[in-house]
Curated annotation (Swiss-Prot):
PANTHER family (alphabetical): MALONATE-SEMIALDEHYDE DEHYDROGENASE
HAMAP family reported in the protein's UniProt record: IolA
Organism name: Bacillus cereus (strain B4264)
Name of this protein: Malonate-semialdehyde dehydrogenase
GO MF: malonate-semialdehyde dehydrogenase (acetylating) activity; methylmalonate-semialdehyde dehydrogenase (acylating, NAD) activity
Keyword NAD included in the entry's annotation: yes
């Protein structure tokens, strides 16, 4: 339940809420007002070790619980999430800043991930082939791997943790969760509801904190696998450090998602799609559209409509249903984003919509409005870097081939979209674009939870993505059995 009092956040270890053994804390402000709403502990290594010990002890019994019984617990958890979805959305808006509409959408996507986890009995089924030789049968069995950990970002404080621990736990593992210290309140509520669903103590443990918690997770010998979502430099570090310590690691990283706009697109729907992809959630998502490659033939018309519609967007507190763009997560991030806008101007791009100029009525929050640049090229930082904000760059290209070439020159390859009514264009795009997730007239090509989620190149470090059968394979190990009976 949301209150006005400043909350002191705790860890959850072995079924109990406990104070961190450390003394260092970090203030958690409401991004829309700057007012402090909580203090989160920056837990030391000792807290991680206690959480791992609890998870390791719980694994001995939880891994032996029949798979259907594990799923029944998750059905109860799913029901509790559905019953509390309005409260969960409000917590997200309070501590993350995204609009209540965006937060409600995130809650639904998180619930869908838990729905996937409830189907684990089907997803964990192995394979069998009788009589591979005279009197000999062969089969593959899947087993849990032990204690696993998840490190999640601030931008989707519900959806991304729910990509991880429900599926891992359904597969018979136990879990140590480290969510972003910027959004600790939603993590607390997720854990509360988890134990209301009747799970045994120690199956899920929550350790709040920063880099010390991350390093402790990566170095702990009893953690078998680590799931991570965050920025590219940190993802690279997590992957390299975790694998060096013998862990299975999936690290989902940054993005610079391109959308190619063809002359045969549906102009109205394309403009609205680009606006939604670029500016919803304040652009703080790894699937946001941050570059539009528009073909010359339609460029002027597309840009005129895009600019006119973007200027209608209201900026402000996410609890106000009239607002489309909420605050950024922190003042430091706001200053970083303003630096990118200034660099775009200095590099010669044309600033068509200036998000630095927003109504003073938004108050003391960390606001930057929707921003659009035209005349961008590959030498500019605003094209090269992940800005993670409502900043959209437009590059004019002569045709589809040039648009694909431009997109593939980015070091990132998370998502890519084409807007077209031509099936051949869509096919050419699909076959030649380098991206892990592709959309054809789909604004945000984030797949449903029963498909894998992962990018290519600097957008992903690892082999198996999150969700779907990839997720089950990541959280289990195979045993191949060849047997003969006399």
């Amino acid at each position: 339940m949301i209150t006005t009092e400043i909350k002191r956040v705790k860890n959850h270890i072995n079924g109990e809420w406990v104070e961190s053994t450390g003394t260092e804390v970090e203030a958690v402000p409401n991004p829309a007002t700057g007012k402090i709403i909580a203090y989160v502990p920056l837990s030391p290594k000792e807290d991680v070790e206690k959480a791992v010990e609890a998870a390791k002890a719980a694994f001995e019994t939880w891994s032996k619980v029949p798979v259907p019984n594990r799923s029944r617990n998750l059905y109860k958890y799913l029901q509790l999430l559905q019953e509390n979805k309005d409260e969960l959305a409000k917590i997200i808006t309070l501590e993350n800043g995204k609009t209540l509409t965006d937060a409600t959408g995130e809650v639904q996507r998180g619930i869908e991930a838990v729905e996937l986890a409830t189907s684990t009995p089907n997803l964990m089924m192995g394979q069998a082939l009788p009589n591979i030789a005279s009197g000999i049968d062969g089969s593959i069995w899947r087993y849990p791997i032990g204690v696993v950990a998840g490190i999640t970002p601030f931008n989707f404080p519900m959806m991304i943790p729910l990509w991880m621990f429900p599926l891992a736990i359904a597969c018979g593992n136990t879990f140590v969760l480290k969510t972003s210290e910027r959004t600790p309140l939603l993590a607390e509520r997720l854990v509360e509801l988890f134990y209301e669903a009747g799970f045994p103590k120690g199956v899920l443990n929550l350790v709040q904190g920063g880099k010390d918690v991350v390093n402790s997770i990566l170095e702990n010998k009893d953690i078998q696998a680590v799931s991570f979502v965050g920025s590219e430099p940190v993802a690279r570090y997590v992957y390299e450090t975790g694998t060096k310590h013998g862990k299975r690691v999936q690290a989902l990283a940054g993005a610079k998602n391109h959308a190619i706009v063809m002359p045969d697109c549906n102009l109205e729907k394309t403009v609205q799609g680009v606006i939604g992809s670029a500016f919803a959630s304040s652009g703080e998502r790894c699937m946001a559209c941050s570059v539009v490659a528009v073909v010359d033939e339609i460029a002027d018309e597309f840009i005129d409509v895009l600019v006119a519609e973007t200027k209608k967007l209201k900026v402000g507190d996410g609890f106000n249903e009239d607002n489309y763009v909420g605050p950024l997560i922190r003042e430091s991030h706001k200053e970083r984003v303003l630096g990118y806008i200034n660099s775009g101007v200095a590099d010669g791009a044309t600033l068509l919509v200036d998000g630095r100029k927003i109504n003073e009525e938004v108050g003391e929050g960390y606001f930057v409005g929707a921003t659009i640049f035209d005349g961008v090229n590959q030498e500019m930082k605003i094209w090269q870097d992940e800005i993670f904000a409502p900043v959209l760059s437009i590059v004019r290209v002569k045709d589809l081939e040039e648009g694909i070439k431009l997109t593939n020159q980015s070091k990132f390859a998370n998502g890519a979209v084409i807007y077209t009514s031509n099936g051949k264009h869509a096919q050419t795009f699909r076959d030649n674009i380098d991206a892990g997730m592709i959309g054809v007239n789909v604004n945000v090509p984030a797949p449903m939870a029963f498909f894998a989620f992962a990018g290519n190149k600097a957008s992903f470090f690892g082999d198996l993505g999150t969700n779907g059968t990839d997720g089950v394979q990541f959280y289990t190990r195979k045993k191949v059995v060849t047997e003969r009976w006399f």
